Every structure is written in structure tokens, then in C-alpha cells.
Amino acid sequence: MLELKNIYKTFNPGTINEKVALNGLNLTLNEGDFVTVIGGNGAGKSTMLNAVAGTWMVDEGQIIIDGIDVTKLSEHKRAAYLGRVFQDPMTGTAATMGIEENLALAKRRGKTRFLKPGITKKEREEYKELLKILGLGLEDRLTSKVGLLSGGQRQALTLLMATLQKPKLLLLDEHTAALDPKTAAKVLEITEMIVNRDHLTTMMITHNMQDALTHGNRLIMMMEGKIILDIQGEEKKKLTVRNLLDQFEKASGQEFSNDSALLS
């Protein structure tokens, strides 16, 4: 479903601020993989997601999504294959529009140049059923402005919008990092439910090692623009945070320096 072949990306090359962000990165995701991505600050996690999304072009290498070479495609054209949720709950929704209007935008994205006038009764019932699954009471607030929602409600709505058209690949860039622990747990529960229900191939960046172990069927750890650990299946299920830290230290020869990753 996703192939990253020998990907390189350097920012500010030839200057005092030169930074090698991706350094010969290779990764293959099978259809239905739910991969959690961890690593210290500057490891290349977000750069990898941005490279896949086309936010910036890679210097070398090849990116293939569902058998299609998208390496040279613009971010706009790649959006047809992708769903994405960012860290900031304010990103991904239109604050001044109603919940149902936001869902209508997501549903019609890429299908027509102009929005249809109004929302049909059939669409409204469909949105109610979709929102009911979230368990947040939003199905009774279809006309409420999204700007009035809590951060958790808004992020759950963004997640629903990002997956409405069943994307080939779902990218989650620390999408619970700005939420309180209780709300983050709820959004992760919703994430797991949607990903499993729709069999979505997913990459989820997190700084929380326990979340990385709890969710998904596969875990990768990055360092200096490369993948240094790739754990899946039964091996992943048996891991503890301590085991994971030990494996990191063995693979890298360093201690893991990001204390926030130890939170559970």
C-alpha cells in the first residue's frame, strides 16, 4: 500500500543550518497496517509524513501509494489518496461553519467543483449515524458551529472527516498531543475503532510510548532520519515500555532522551 524507497531530504543544504532530516529511509506498509511511529525530537517522524503527503518534495528516492508513483505529484494531487489529522485541533475543520456543513465539505471533496446548495435529508441522517458512533453527542448538534466544540470533540470530528471517503492511507501527526489525557484516550479509542472498521492503512506519530505499544499492529522507531526498530505482531504485543527502551539503546547505542515518551 505504501512504499518509501531510499528517501533523502535535507533542509538548508550547503548552509550553516543544514539538517539531514531523512537519510536513506526505506519502509513498506501492507494494506491494513496500523503503524505507530516514535522517536526523539528531530528523528524525522513528521518529515516522513510530510514527504508522503507532498508537503515538500524529497531530494532522492521514490514514494509509491497503492501501486502509483506519487514522488513528483503535488500535495494537492496526493490529497486524493490521503486522509490526514494534525496535532492542532483547530486545523482540519472550518470553525465558522456547522458540523453538518463540515461533513458535507469532506464528503464532496474532489467530487465536484462546486458545493451543492444545502444538505439533503438523506445526508443529514447519514451524518447523524456517523456522529452517533463517536459517542460524543454531536449527532444532536448538527448545526452547531465547530468553533464552539471542545478540542477533543473537534479532533474527533476532524478524524471522521479525514476518513469519510476511505482514504488509501491515513496520516495521524500526533493528533492527540494537544489534548488532556482523558480526552486523548477517547480520541485514540475512536481512532482504533474507525481504522479497524474500515481496514485503513494508517501511520500514527506519537510521543507516548505506551500509546505506541497499545495501538496498531506494528511499531517503528526513528532516529536521525532512519528506521532503527521495526516491531510487529506477537513481538509487539508482548513489549513493555522498558523492553522498548532497552531495544532502542541496543539498536542506537544511546539512551532515549525524550522524557515525555515515557508517559502512560
PLM regions and their residue ranges:
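A short, flexible loop at the N-terminus of ABC-type nucleotide-binding domains that lies
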Residues: 1, 10-24, 74
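ABC ATPase NBD coupling module
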Residues: 15, 57, 69-83, 91, ...
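Helix-to-loop junction immediately C-terminal to a conserved catalytic motif
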Residues: 53
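The feature captures the beta-strand-to-loop junction immediately N-terminal to the Walker
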Residues: 38-40
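Conserved beta-strand-loop-alpha-helix hinge in the C-terminal portion
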Residues: 226-252
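Conserved ABC transporter NBD signature motif
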Residues: 61-68, 229-231
